[in-house]
Amino acid sequence: KMPVILFVDTFNRYYEPENVRSAINVLKKAGYYPFIPTLSNSSKILCCGRTYLSNGLIDNAKKEMLDILDAFRPYIKQGISVVGLEPSCILSFRDEIPNLIKTEETEYLKNNSYTFEELLIKKSKKIKFRSINKKVLLHGHCHQKAFDAVKPIENLLNKIEGLEVENIQTSCCGMAGSFGYGKDTYDISMKMANERLFPTIKENSNDVVVIADGTSCRCQIKDGLNREAVHLAKF
């Protein structure tokens, strides 16, 4: 099996570890051997620094990024790719990290880091899809949209016989990290969610599955509508 670094972000690690377990199982069935690197001289949990970046704490974010490089270095030298579940985290490997730290290693990460579905689509011929007579609503995370990374999810879902896929034509869900939790920004967050995302979900019955790879998107849907949205890996 082809080895691949699985970058486990803070949100999925602590709040939805079932997504990580599901991703590992799916990746194995697709012919990959996912593994989770750690720092050799520390028990510190790796973080991409996204939460620091979102608050302008660049130096703090760079420290987290340097830890990732230390942990990944032996595997980067072997030409092993990286896959992640949280779009805003894994896509920082293609954007913020190589822009803030300019080395051959970060350039490698820029060109060899993939979202879960981007990696799976490469091996889709090896995956045995079960037929499912269901409808799913797909909400793309803002980072996925910015990197044109929603299409791979659609392509994978369309390989499942009997599955009806509707890609909700939305902008941001309104949560935007912690934006939707702010006292001064809550109303704006709700207005954004009620533009298209919430109405589309409410138009569909509860047996329609909502797929959203972004943790903040799933939280917005859960808090705003009391509907469970799932990561593609769990679906």
Task: Show the residue positions of the predicted features.
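Iron-sulfur cluster-binding electron-transfer modules in prokaryotic oxidoreductases
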Residues: 1-235
